[in-house]
Swiss-Prot record:
NCBIfam families: rplV_bact. It holds the Pfam family Ribosomal_L22. GO terms for molecular function: rRNA binding; structural constituent of ribosome. InterPro entries: Ribosomal_uL22 (IPR001063), Ribosomal_uL22_bac/chlpt-type (IPR005727), Ribosomal_uL22_bac/org-type (IPR047867), Ribosomal_uL22_CS (IPR018260), Ribosomal_uL22_sf (IPR036394). The keyword Transmembrane does not apply. Disulfide bonds: none annotated. The keyword Amino-acid biosynthesis does not apply. CDD domains: Ribosomal_L22. The gene is rplV. Keywords: Ribonucleoprotein, Ribosomal protein, RNA-binding, rRNA-binding. This is Large ribosomal subunit protein uL22.
């Protein structure tokens, strides 16, 4: 049984954004779980047109966290982000021989929740893994040297 840790958070929503939800989700998947600074850097250079409205919502959520909740902007992480479908505006495009095609102008609702998480301690776990790797390498070198020495001595 695991207990979920509650971190202080802030939310921002952009509703009726004139981009389809599927196009927004392509961009959203790039930044989910990243820090706010890293997410904004990724979106700044992403070629997709949906990156601009998604970046605006993330920046708004970060501003809400800083101004309303008093959270440190450097420790913010994009915890939850999703795009739901909004209403579709339907238009008619006249075509040849009296026909008409329907144009669907899709909208989406983008929701972002940022959390203030403490920085991860990279010292202990990474150091022990590299130390164990070094010990294994040293042991295998010693074993190889011992084996070559014993072969030379028997000849």
């Amino acid at each position: 049984m695991t207990t979920a840790i509650e971190y202080p958070s802030a939310m921002a929503k952009a509703r009726f954004v004139r981009i389809s939800a599927t196009k927004a989700r392509r961009v959203i998947d790039l930044v989910r779980g990243k820090s706010v600074e890293e997410a904004l850097d990724i979106l700044r250079w992403a070629p997709q047109s949906a990156s601009e409205p998604v970046a605006k919502v993330i920046a708004s959520a970060a501003a809400n966290a800083q101004n309303n909740e008093g959270l440190d902007p450097t420790s913010l992480v994009v915890a939850t982000i999703h795009a739901d479908e909004g209403p579709t505006a339907k238009r008619i495009r006249p075509r040849a021989q009296g026909r008409a095609y329907r144009i669907r102008k899709r909208t989406s609702h983008i929701t972002v929740i940022v959390e203030s998480r403490p920085p991860k301690k990279a010292g202990k776990q990474g150091a022990s893994a590299s130390a164990a790797r070094a010990r294994r390498a040293q042991a295998s070198k010693a074993a190889t040297k011992k084996a070559t020495d014993s072969k030379e001595g028997s000849e």
